[in-house]
């Protein structure tokens, strides 16, 4: 039987780490070669793309932008910049109209400098920031540029001090940091109340399924076989090069292929629409193999 290859999109439930979801999928699919595209904090729900088999090699080529729907709690500051952490300050929030609150969001639209939360997966001298934070260390995490492509105010509840936002942003953006920084800008502090990811790496909620239960762990009907999303469907933003049978043989042996159009990463397909890998087009009218699924000596 051919090894599985493709993507499955999980609607991650609250309370599980992204790694726990990957571990579950390894048991369900009975393969170790499983990886995820974009870590979600345990409390966060929503779209978690899972790559299976050689599709794990395609993760760097997927579009990195993500979309979230979140609720920010003003007036509360915590050690983790969300309600999962220890409350360190409580203040009154300002009496703002919907229009004034929307204007307050303007400095956070576009490309901004953002400091990651103290409790985050950012590497600091080879160690995750959250590991050092658990030891009580306060880390100086430098700001880094992120892009918030759109920031929409969905609802502002003054009585509760809660605002609901939809955020479309670049990879590496922390919505917890956005909540913290907005609270600081308003002079009242703030943290993330809840968060759901609605789009990641080109996959949306409509692609997502509930996290499957391993057959040995369920008491109900047997698990339906999972249908993996073909890898080329996740790479629609890239150009395509279809190979002839002769070119396919050359490709499998790692030889360059004549290629006249475009440059950069290119999806390589067979004549029967099977993905063969990723090539890098160059200015010399060549397509150089970068990821080859059917490699031969």
From Swiss-Prot:
One of its GO terms (molecular function) is tRNA pseudouridine(55) synthase activity. Transmembrane segments: none annotated. The keyword Isomerase applies. Its EC number is 5.4.99.25. One of its GO terms (biological process) is tRNA pseudouridine synthesis. Responsible for synthesis of pseudouridine from uracil-55 in the psi GC loop of transfer RNAs. This is tRNA pseudouridine synthase B. The gene is truB.
